[in-house]
Amino acid sequence: MTQKLHIKTWGCQMNEYDSSKMADLLQSTHGLELTEEAEQADVLLLNTCSIREKAQEKVFHQLGRWKELKKKNPNLVIGVGGCVASQEGEHIRERAPYVDIIFGPQTLHRLPEMINQIRAGEKAVLDISFPEIEKFDRLPEPKAEGPTAFVSIMEGCNKYCTYCVVPYTRGEEVSRPLDDVLFEIAQLAEQGVREVNLLGQNVNAYRGPTHDGGICSFAELLRLVAAIDGIDRLRFTTSNPIEFTDDIIDVYRDTPELVSFLHLPVQAGSDRILTMMKRGHTAIEYKSIIRKLRAVRPNIQISSDFIVGFPGETNEEFEQTMNLIQQVNFDMSFSFVYSARPGTPAADMPDDVTEEEKKQRLYILQQRINNQAAQFSRAMLGTEQRVLVEGPSKKDIMELTGRTENNRIVNFAGTPDMIGKFVDIKITDVFTNSLRGDVVRTEDQMGLRVVQSPQAVINRTRKEDELGVGRFGG
């Protein structure tokens, strides 16, 4: 009888990527099939996030539910991974002794051995070490699920913003070798992927080793990925303003595959608060990046992250954030009230903004950005938009749905052969959460750029050096 795996994932896109790799890995090593029902599972994995408030309590609340399942099935294997596991591994073991496996973001590739250890009789396994980039060398080949895919290109962060736990939970910045990244993307392109989203906690800090001993910059990587035939839409998440160099802006000038939509976190509009956060840039420097981007891509839309109610933030400083929002004209945001993260420098600062004031500021900020987003959507009425078709519409299975470059959902009447391809749509209706339109052009009428076939990348000879690290030769 086939054994089942249930994974519950919280947090960022990197966690979503990690969870998909766990599923692929355990399917290849143990034949575990994914199930949406925890009650059916033989292995339960919780992939955690420590960014949000009360992250630890949320974990223990979920584990309490799974404890009841373990009482009914003593052979059930329970594992906790992700950033809370990395930060609170020993505490989880003490407070939830029924948890079998505790692993960090950098040790998920060791899950097969950990499960084997538990099934061989070991009481518990804890591995929250930071073996750099080893996990990518131990994961199975990627499997495409639809026309879009995430590809992790680097891990960790060296910036140590005062409010953030990422450097402590995912370690310092480590970039994947260039050829490993290109090989994975070429494999996905061979399977029909058309849009790739490059992932990293500080993605534009990518400095990937090349097979000849050199270093590939993030800007160079963007051009190389965009040149792979079939990859006709390219995104990246999450970037840092202090790493947003002019060579990246130049890619926006001459690389049509790179979308006219950018997520660039700023967190606040007050220079004093930015200094307290140790962000490493001013509001003017942030606006300078946006100005340069719009000089080469006038239609680019920007989303961002904001923290309101940071320790010591005054009403005047919050207004500076609101002024920045208006000046940049953000299309979207991930915005949150400040809450202290244990072990971070900001946790030692007086949290002197009341919860009521934080919530009020958050409401004001989100209303402003929602209004700006609605204006962007209304401006799309009557325009032609290139849409990547994802499948049948959730609203009407007789119609199709897809996304624009700026992440708007578009529903339209189409044919099944359009799924997984691009179509140009004239927008006829604008709704709160979606758009509607008519097909004006199919992919075979677009003349998309053709540079290098995925097979040409895959066919490069993969070799290993004396340390067993894979590389590509000529």
Swiss-Prot record:
<dbReference type="Pfam" id="PF01938">
    <property type="entry name" value="TRAM"/>
</dbReference>
<dbReference type="Pfam" id="PF00919">
    <property type="entry name" value="UPF0004"/>
</dbReference>
<dbReference type="InterPro" id="IPR005839">
    <property type="entry name" value="Methylthiotransferase"/>
</dbReference>
<dbReference type="GO" id="GO:0035597">
    <property type="term" value="F:N6-isopentenyladenosine methylthiotransferase activity"/>
</dbReference>
<comment type="function">
    <text>Catalyzes the methylthiolation of N6-(dimethylallyl)adenosine (i(6)A), leading to the formation of 2-methylthio-N6-(dimethylallyl)adenosine (ms(2)i(6)A) at position 37 in tRNAs that read codons beginning with uridine.</text>
</comment>
<dbReference type="InterPro" id="IPR013848">
    <property type="entry name" value="Methylthiotransferase_N"/>
</dbReference>
<keyword id="KW-0408">Iron</keyword>
<keyword id="KW-0004">4Fe-4S</keyword>
<feature type="binding site">
    <location>
        <position position="12"/>
    </location>
    <ligand>
        <name>[4Fe-4S] cluster 1</name>
    </ligand>
</feature>
<keyword id="KW-0949">S-adenosyl-L-methionine</keyword>
<dbReference type="InterPro" id="IPR007197">
    <property type="entry name" value="rSAM"/>
</dbReference>
<dbReference type="Pfam" id="PF04055">
    <property type="entry name" value="Radical_SAM"/>
</dbReference>
<dbReference type="InterPro" id="IPR006638">
    <property type="entry name" value="Elp3/MiaA/NifB-like_rSAM"/>
</dbReference>
<feature type="binding site">
    <location>
        <position position="164"/>
    </location>
    <ligand>
        <name>[4Fe-4S] cluster 2</name>
    </ligand>
</feature>
<keyword id="KW-0808">Transferase</keyword>
<comment type="similarity">
    <text>Belongs to the methylthiotransferase family. MiaB subfamily.</text>
</comment>
<dbReference type="GO" id="GO:0005829">
    <property type="term" value="C:cytosol"/>
</dbReference>
<feature type="binding site">
    <location>
        <position position="157"/>
    </location>
    <ligand>
        <name>[4Fe-4S] cluster 2</name>
    </ligand>
</feature>
<dbReference type="InterPro" id="IPR006463">
    <property type="entry name" value="MiaB_methiolase"/>
</dbReference>
<dbReference type="GO" id="GO:0046872">
    <property type="term" value="F:metal ion binding"/>
</dbReference>
<feature type="binding site">
    <location>
        <position position="161"/>
    </location>
    <ligand>
        <name>[4Fe-4S] cluster 2</name>
    </ligand>
</feature>
<dbReference type="InterPro" id="IPR020612">
    <property type="entry name" value="Methylthiotransferase_CS"/>
</dbReference>
<feature type="domain" description="Radical SAM core">
    <location>
        <begin position="143"/>
        <end position="375"/>
    </location>
</feature>
<keyword id="KW-0411">Iron-sulfur</keyword>
<dbReference type="GO" id="GO:0051539">
    <property type="term" value="F:4 iron, 4 sulfur cluster binding"/>
</dbReference>
<keyword id="KW-0963">Cytoplasm</keyword>
<feature type="domain" description="TRAM">
    <location>
        <begin position="378"/>
        <end position="441"/>
    </location>
</feature>
<protein>
    <recommendedName>
        <fullName>tRNA-2-methylthio-N(6)-dimethylallyladenosine synthase</fullName>
        <ecNumber>2.8.4.3</ecNumber>
    </recommendedName>
</protein>
<feature type="binding site">
    <location>
        <position position="49"/>
    </location>
    <ligand>
        <name>[4Fe-4S] cluster 1</name>
    </ligand>
</feature>
<keyword id="KW-0479">Metal-binding</keyword>
<feature type="binding site">
    <location>
        <position position="83"/>
    </location>
    <ligand>
        <name>[4Fe-4S] cluster 1</name>
    </ligand>
</feature>
<dbReference type="InterPro" id="IPR002792">
    <property type="entry name" value="TRAM_dom"/>
</dbReference>
<dbReference type="InterPro" id="IPR023404">
    <property type="entry name" value="rSAM_horseshoe"/>
</dbReference>
<comment type="subunit">
    <text>Monomer.</text>
</comment>
<keyword id="KW-0819">tRNA processing</keyword>
<feature type="domain" description="MTTase N-terminal">
    <location>
        <begin position="3"/>
        <end position="120"/>
    </location>
</feature>
<dbReference type="InterPro" id="IPR038135">
    <property type="entry name" value="Methylthiotransferase_N_sf"/>
</dbReference>
